[in-house]
Amino acid sequence: MTPACFFLRCTIVLLAVLAVPCAHAQDTKSLARDIKNPFAKLPNLQVFYDANLNTGPQHQTQHVVNVRPVIPFDVGTDWSLITRSIFPVIAQPGTAPGSSWTTGPGDSMVAAFLSPAQAEHFVWGLGPVLQIPTASNDALGQGKWAGGPAAGAVWVGEQWTIGALVNNVWSFAGDHSRPAVNQLQFEPQITYNFVSNPDRYLTFAPTITANWKASGGERWTVPVTLGIGQLVKFGKQAANLQASAYYNVIKPSDASNWTLELTIQFLFPR
C-alpha cells in the first residue's frame, strides 16, 4: 500500500470519528482549548506519523514516527516548567538506485519552557532547547550536540488559538568530522474550534526551518499546511486525533514536496 493510500484510508476513519460528537462535550471544552496551547499544564503524549513524499534523488517516501511527551511541573505557585521532547524513528530511503533503506532513531530534542502558572488568555514561555545526537546512523541525524534559546507565546480564546514557538540551536560538541549545526525552527499556529462542536477544529501550523550553514537556495523550508482534528474519548481516556497535509513552497532540492501527517495525542488532565 502506498503512503498516499494509507493516509487516505486513515483519514476516512478519522472523518468517521469526526462525524460523531465527543461524549460529555461540556466536560472537554477546556481540553479542546488546551490541546493547542503549548504552555497548558496538561500532561500529554503525542505520536506523529509523517509520510514525506518524493524525498531524495530517487523521489521516494521517507517515513517518520515522532514520539513527543509533554510534561509540566509546578515551580512554586506562580510558575510552571513545561518540558517538550521529540524522539524520532526514521525510515530513510537510499540515495542511489538499488541502495538499501536506513531505519532507526534520529536525533532527539528536549526543550524546557518557564511560563507563568496563572496566565489565562495570553501565555508565554522562555527556556533552553537541546539537540542530542541519538541517531543510530549518519543518514538519520547530524551527529552533533547543539543547544540554544527557545521562546513562544500564544493567545487562547473561545474559538481561536493563535501563537508561535521559535528556537535556534548551535552545535558545541559531537563528531568533529560532521558539519557544524546552526539552524532555526519557527512554528506559527492558528487554530479554530467550531462553534457548533468545540471539540472539532481546523489548524494551520507549519514548521518553518532555516539551515544557516546552507547556501541560499538550500537554506529554507517553508510549508503551507491545513489540518483537521477532533477531541475524542476511548472509555475514560481523552485523546486528540488529527490529519494534516503540508506542501513545501520553498525547500532544499532533496527535500519532500508533500508531507501527509496523522497524529494521536493522549491527554492526562490533572
Language-model-derived ranges and their functions:
Residues 25-270:
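Transmembrane beta-barrel domains of Gram-negative outer membranes and organellar outer membranes
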